[in-house]
């Protein structure tokens, strides 16, 4: 069994970069297709980001800004502004469980377990 801390078998800076990019993508797009291992790790990070976005304070904005990538959207907002203006209020009455993982058939090239992770 693989060490859960080092699930990707890469160094920690690479893991953090991949998780940050995937978390930003799921906040912006609402759903992404990735491997099952990445989706399971990503779920906890996205849930924590949305929980912080529900309480719109300066401290929670700074905490989320330290993790999310600063991507400019088409409507002029950044990914952080979108998280706090659209995603956070959407889940105001929900206590956790903001994401869903749907399993897909294995990838054809290397037979990796694939899944879709999406916001509920």
UniProtKB/Swiss-Prot annotation:
UniProt superkingdom: Bacteria
GO molecular-function terms, A-Z: structural constituent of ribosome
Pfam families tied to this protein: Ribosomal_L17
Gene3D superfamilies attached to this UniProt entry: Ribosomal protein L17
GO CC terms of this entry: cytosolic large ribosomal subunit
SUPFAM superfamilies attached to this UniProt entry: Prokaryotic ribosomal protein L17
Keyword terms, alphabetized: Ribonucleoprotein, Ribosomal protein
GO biological process: translation
Binding partners and assembly: Part of the 50S ribosomal subunit. Contacts protein L32.
Similarity remark: Belongs to the bacterial ribosomal protein bL17 family.
Protein name per Swiss-Prot or TrEMBL: Large ribosomal subunit protein bL17
Source organism of the structure: Mycoplasma mobile (strain ATCC 43663 / 163K / NCTC 11711) (Mesomycoplasma mobile)
């Amino acid at each position: 069994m693989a060490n859960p801390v080092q699930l990707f078998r890469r160094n920690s800076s690479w893991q953090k970069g991949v998780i940050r990019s995937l978390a930003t993508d799921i906040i912006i797009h609402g759903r992404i297709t990735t491997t099952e291992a990445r989706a399971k790790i990503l779920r906890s990070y996205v849930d924590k980001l949305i929980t912080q976005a529900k309480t719109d304070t300066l401290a929670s904005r700074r905490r989320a800004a330290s993790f999310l990538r600063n991507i400019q959207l088409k409507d002029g907002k950044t990914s952080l502004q979108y998280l706090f203006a659209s995603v956070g209020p959407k889940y105001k009455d929900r206590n956790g469980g903001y994401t869903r993982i749907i399993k897909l058939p294995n990838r054809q090239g290397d037979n990796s377990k694939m899944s879709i992770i999406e916001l509920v």
